Amino acid sequence: MKIIKVTDLNLKDKKVLIRSDLNVPIKNGKIMCNMRIIKSLETINFVIKNEAKCVIVASHLGNPIEEKYDYNFSLTHIVNHMKKIIKYPIRLIQNYLNGFEAKEKEIIVLENVRFNPGERKNDKNLSKKYANLCDILVMDSFGSSHRSESSTTGIIKFAPISCIGLLFLKEIKYLKKALFNSKRPIVTIFGGSKISTKLGVIEKLSNISENVLVGGGIANTILFSKGHNIGKSLHDKNNISKIKKFLYKKNIIIPKDFIVTDNINKFSSYKEKSIKEIKNEDYIVDIGKKSCECFIKIIKKAKTIFWNGPLGLIEIKQFRNGTKEIANSVIHSSAKSIIGGGETVLAMRMFNFIDRFSYISTGGGAFLSFIEKQELPVLSELKKFKKYTNFKQN
């Protein structure tokens, strides 16, 4: 069934709630990467220019404990940043579930939806309260569309009209095109610390990619599954059986050497070792020189590159080199490059490479989930929405 787009609707004099993705990395109150905020503005501006009576923006930020306000997770930081880059008045509201008053042409930002009890559990009553705030719901948060929560899938069931936003639509259109109309060879790069969420998509992309290059916790888990000593390195013992499904695929390339340390901090000394040289007290924190050379050789031949997750511990400067070297080879290749995931985007911003990729997705888990299944819980709900399937502009 066709999904209603925000461009299909007459927004004039309507209360419009936009579920955006403003979940950005913040350190000591400072926004480290504002990409998601910037990309969300297209839909917000579209709604304002089409004369909505009230523009309401909702988002989550991080993983606070439900029912407990925590300033570190407050959207105060986001709103203060938005005030600098948008010309309309913006106001943050903390208590909004029972309604509120808004001035004309004012943007209302709702405080972190994850402060609300029941949000993560997709509570029906909470979903209804969100829906009661608007005439039209615009689902624009691609980054959280793989989650079934009250402000994602739940609200769609109860909003008078539910539609898809401009950013969300761009994401799925681009990723579909990249998946099904990509030039070959296709090379996929996987790293990062989140392992279990990537196993399905690794298997999927290993079937359509000429090569899959892995680092980080995923490489460690594969090495551990093969019986290698990885010392104290990050790995996922709970998913060994799933890893074994693609353990010996010839197109999955794991590092041959590593940067290791016996103490993880910014003053740590480190050594380069082969897998056979790793000791019980070692932590693998980056890929080594030989692995970089091997990966770069493969990347040079690629025509399409998918990338999710850094290859080393990028939080510490001396363990970023592997990720930086590989990123440098990607941006200087002739390949179309598609990256996704918060850590990946943050790393590229650190290296000042952020504008050098063909496409940067705002999704991490959603990016992976859509690549794996070409479907998302939020998309499924939007397809079910039948109340106004014949609703026309004006």
Curated annotation (Swiss-Prot):
Binding site for substrate: D21, L22, N23, R36, H60, L61, G62, N63, R114, R147
A Pfam cross-reference name: PGK
GO molecular function, one term: phosphoglycerate kinase activity
Compartment list: Cytoplasm
Enzyme class: transferase
Any one GO CC term of the record: cytosol
Catalytic activity as recorded in UniProt: (2R)-3-phosphoglycerate + ATP = (2R)-3-phospho-glyceroyl phosphate + ADP
InterPro entries: Phosphoglycerate_kinase, Phosphoglycerate_kinase_CS, Phosphoglycerate_kinase_N, Phosphoglycerate_kinase_sf
Biological processes, Gene Ontology terms: gluconeogenesis; glycolytic process
Keywords assigned by UniProt, alphabetized: ATP-binding, Cytoplasm, Glycolysis, Kinase, Nucleotide-binding, Transferase
EC number: 2.7.2.3
Highest rank taxon of the organism: Bacteria
Family per similarity comment: Belongs to the phosphoglycerate kinase family.
Protein name: Phosphoglycerate kinase
Organism listed in the record: Wigglesworthia glossinidia brevipalpis
